[in-house]
Design a protein with these regions (language model features):
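Compositionally biased P/S/T/G-rich terminal and signal peptide-adjacent segments
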Residues: 2-9
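Acidic-basic catalytic patches of nuclease active cores, encompassing PD-(D/E)XK
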Residues: 9-68
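Conserved catalytic cores of phosphodiester-cleaving nucleases, focusing on short active-site segments
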Residues: 45, 75-85, 94-106
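Intrinsically disordered, low-complexity Ser/Thr- and acidic-rich flexible linkers and loops
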Residues: 64-66, 84-91
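Beta-rich catalytic cores
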Residues: 72
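Catalytic cores of nucleic-acid endonucleases
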Residues: 89-156
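Domain-level recognition of nuclease-like catalytic cores that cleave nucleotide substrates
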Residues: 128-198
Length: 198
């Protein structure tokens, strides 16, 4: 026979202690937005016929227990076959991109303060490296997905994902942006307005 057991808290105040302080809640929500942003970027790349493999530090157990400095690891490696027809027949070539995904509510702060450091860390190890900056607060008619690359003069350039050479259609970027905003809006509902930042 099945018995249902109800467990009551020892005192009424114990439930109040479950709710984290605003700062901790904001950090948690921003972390969730970052992980959700990674999933959206992975889906966008797969939709553009890329194969995607997670290679970031979180994906490898040895890096979780290793002490000391480690080589920079992007979140994903994305690749797809590019047909190259020449005089000797078609050759199989692959376009490979190292992708780091960053969520920021205020993308302009990331561009000025953090992006150069990220590119300095990654540039030596990953020649075809880009950052996809995910935001729920895009400027003008831009999508929520901005691709950052460093040019020959070491200046960081920002381009909408629909114009970044990944073959992501602008309608797809707009559809994913709308969905992302709805998901992030739901997360924001749980955080008081003064706690939303980053």
């Amino acid at each position: 026979m099945f018995h249902r057991r109800i467990v009551a808290p020892k005192d009424r105040d114990s439930l109040k202690r479950v709710t984290p302080a605003i700062g901790h809640l904001t950090d948690l929500v921003n972390h969730l937005k970052g992980r959700i942003g990674e999933a959206f970027v992975e889906a966008l790349l797969r939709r553009a016929n890329y194969s995607v493999s997670r290679v970031g530090r979180e994906a490898h157990l040895p890096s979780l227990i290793k002490a000391g400095p480690t080589t920079y690891m992007p979140d994903f490696l994305a690749w797809r076959e590019e047909r190259n027809s020449g005089s000797s027949g078609s050759t199989q070539l692959f376009s490979i991109v190292a992708v780091e995904v960053k969520y920021r509510r205020q993308p302009e702060r990331f561009l000025t303060d953090e992006a150069p450091k990220v590119f300095d860390e990654a540039g030596d190890h990953w020649p075809n490296f880009c950052v996809v900056l995910v935001t729920d607060n895009p400027e003008g008619g831009c999508s929520c997905f901005q691709v950052l690359r460093r040019d020959q003069t070491r200046r960081v350039e920002c381009t909408d994902i629909a114009n970044a050479g990944f073959d992501v259609y602008s309608t797809t970027a707009a559809m994913f942006s709308l969905l992302l905003k709805q998901v992030f809006h739901s997360l924001n509902e749980g955080v008081p307005a003064e706690g939303i930042g980053n």
